[in-house]
Amino acid sequence: MSYQLELSFSPVNELINSLHTFLCKSWHKRIDLGPAWTQNVHASLSPEFADQLEQTGIDLEWKLLHLLAYVSPNKNSVEDYLLWMRKLTLGELFAVLSPYVQTFPEDFGAVRDRQHRMLSEWNEVYFKHIDPGIVTALRAEAEEKTGWGEFEAYEKAAALTNGFCFEPVNGLEKLVLIPHYHFQPGNIFYSYGSLTICQYASRIEPHSEEEDEPSLHLYRLLRSLSEKSRLRILHFLRSEPRTFIEVVRHLGISKGITHDHIFNLRCAGLLNVHVVGETVSTYSLRVERIQQIEQGLFDYLGMNPSLLSIPVNEMVEPSNEC
């Protein structure tokens, strides 16, 4: 049993992702852009638009918006997509979405109109002003990774998403991976029956003026190992996948603190996250990421570990001095 894997990207995806990031308040302290990004964007909004976004939740309507962007034939530019979205009749709207979903909001036409106005204004006040290099880099990421032909769909998806293992369950026919920038280090995924769409963290980082600045990817990895409880989680998962509740019981601490520890390990790529539909079923140890820790640190230091080997008989005896 397997599924088809597709790599995709359009500017519309990042338009929606950037707004998703702004709306998802629980992630504002977790994103690589930091809380300052949210504050700066909020300061640029009109009071009316800020109030509208304050009342907008991440719900079924939002899930359908991600799907609509994927099925649209006019998504090479944000302007083309918004024009297509506005001109869709209600019948056409149902026609393009009904192969994947059977549940729709009441008064779907009004929902579409509201989403169109929201995306249009977000594009005007924020998205059209972002560094164009972000979109260019995301498009290049999708094109480059499409060429990873030597991997099976399951393994390729796990590698690109930093450990998300989309299990090949009955009914899943296609997994679409879309690189994103704003919501890093998180992934966003939705299941639509035979189709699953996952926006994954591209690991594209802002330019740093400091030559010795470690990558966020490396820093997150090393920092994730700074808590004893996180090391205990890795040890607990070393032999077989475990559910979240099993991890909580093993640690003997609260669900909230356990969730934070798992979040840090997951974003560092140290855990496999086994996904069934839209549910995380279990976690397991991502051994290949453990093996990359030493090499990642040596790469940052600009050192070749093969040139640093010291024969045992040449090692200095430890001193007894304090």
Enumerate the language-model features and the residues they cover.
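N-terminal, charged low-complexity regulatory/assembly segments
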Residues: 1-170, 174
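Alpha-helical residues within the helix-turn-helix
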Residues: 248-249, 266-267
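C-terminal regulatory or interaction extensions
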Residues: 144-220
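Short capping segments at the starts of secondary-structure elements
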Residues: 228-231, 237-243
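Conserved segment of winged-helix/HTH DNA-binding domains
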Residues: 281-312
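Beta-hairpin "wing" of winged helix-turn-helix
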Residues: 271-277
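Helix-turn-helix DNA-binding motif, specifically the short coil turn and the N-cap/start of the second
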Residues: 254
